[in-house]
Amino acid sequence: MKKTVAVVGVGSAGLQTLCHLCTWLDNTWKIISIHNPEIKAVGVGESTQPPFLGALRTGIDFNVYDHLAPMKATIKVGSVFKKWRKHSFINPLFAGSIALHIDTNAIKDFIIPRLKERWPVKLEVKEQDVQDLNALDYDYIVDCRGYPTDFSEYIKPPAMLINHALIHSFKRPGTTNYTGQTATKDGWMFDIPLPQRHTHGYLYCDKITSQSEAKKNFSKILKVPPSQLDKTEFSFPAYYAKTVFDGRIFKNGNRAFLFEPISALSLYI
C-alpha cells in the first residue's frame, strides 16, 4: 500500500508544493492534487522568488528559453524601489539567481499537464470541492487553499500597515525584468511586468485612507482618470496560523500566514 499525500489548491503555493513533492518523494508515495475548478485565481500577477523557479525546473523540467512565453511569464532579476529614499535603488536577487513574474490565471493550465506527463505513476489530479479536510482519506494533507475564510485558528496582529489593494493593468507588455515597488503617500505600489500586460497595485490601509482618496492618488500616479481605473480590488488582513502542523494536515502559502506582500514571504517560506 502506497503512502498518500494530498495537496489541496492549485495556486502558486499548491503548484510549487506539487513540483517539490513529485521531485523528492519516491514511487512508494502517491501524490494527489485536488482543486475546485469553480474557484478562480485572483489573477493580478505575481512576483516570485528563486525557489519557485527552482521547483519548476525539477518538477516539470522548466527552462526560460522554451517556457516563458507559453506560461505567460517574464524573468525577474530583482526589485526596484522608488521614492523610499532620495534616490531609487535596486535590490538584486542573491548570487546572480533569477525568478519569475507569473500570470496567476495561466500557471495552472501550464504546470498541471506537464506534471502529469512527467510523473504519471506518482501523481493523480482530482477536481473536487473540499469543505472539510478531515474528511479526506489520505495519510497527509497540504492545505494550499489561499486566504482563510474562518480566522478562529489564526492570530491577527493588532496593527496593520496596509490591508487593501486597487489594481489596474495596462494592456501592453511590461518592459523591465524588475518588480516595481514604489512608496506612496498612502503605502506603496507594486508593478508586475508580464508579456501581455503591465499590472499595478496600489496598497493602502482602509482604516486610514478612504477608497475615494486612494483611487484619486492612484489615478494621479498612473495618469488614468479614476473612472477609467479597473474595477479590481480586494482586502487582505494580516494573520498567522496558531499552528502550521495539525496532525496530518499542514498549512502552506497564504493558508499559513500573510504579513505584508512586499517580499512574497508566504510563498518563499
Predicted regions and their residues:
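FAD/FMN-dependent oxidoreductases across multiple families
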Residues: 101, 204-269
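Predominantly flavin-linked oxidoreductase catalytic cores and closely associated redox partners
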Residues: 20, 109-222
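A short, Lys/Arg-enriched amphipathic alpha-helix followed by its capping loop at the start of a domain
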Residues: 17-29, 55, 59, 117-118
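Conserved beta-strand elements of the Class I
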Residues: 6-8, 32, 250
